[in-house]
Amino acid sequence: MRALFLMMFIPFGALALGDGAWQGSGVGVMLDHRGVAASSQPLAPPQPVSGRMSLIAWTYVLDGPTPVGLTVKLCSQTNCTSIDGQSGTTRGLTNTDANEPLRFVWEVPGGGSMYPPLRVRSNQVIVNYTR
């Protein structure tokens, strides 16, 4: 009887210790001056999670052309990692607490105003984590 009980509940315990993921999305920012960084609103898990970040997928949508020299970083509260392109994956924040919010940070080097301004329509992350 005890063996049957253990056999029934071990699979559920194994699932509870497995990996997970959370998704966050938001509207973007407008950047109209070179040499000034702009940060998105924080993207956080909808409910508390426990684990360490592993693979993060991202996407963002711009209104208009991509300014020459645009740099984009994905940042936790303690670290940033550079990302290339409007979508992709990164392991640059591996081992960061999976409960930490993330932000996109955009910057175009130089000085002066930009025309047209950089408008970020939307941004999204999918954070995979291990427990």
Placement of each model-derived feature along the sequence:
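Sec-dependent signal peptide recognition
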Residues: 1-8
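Disulfide-rich extracellular domains of secreted proteins
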Residues: 16-131
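N-terminal signal peptide c-region/cleavage motif recognized by signal peptidases
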Residues: 11-13
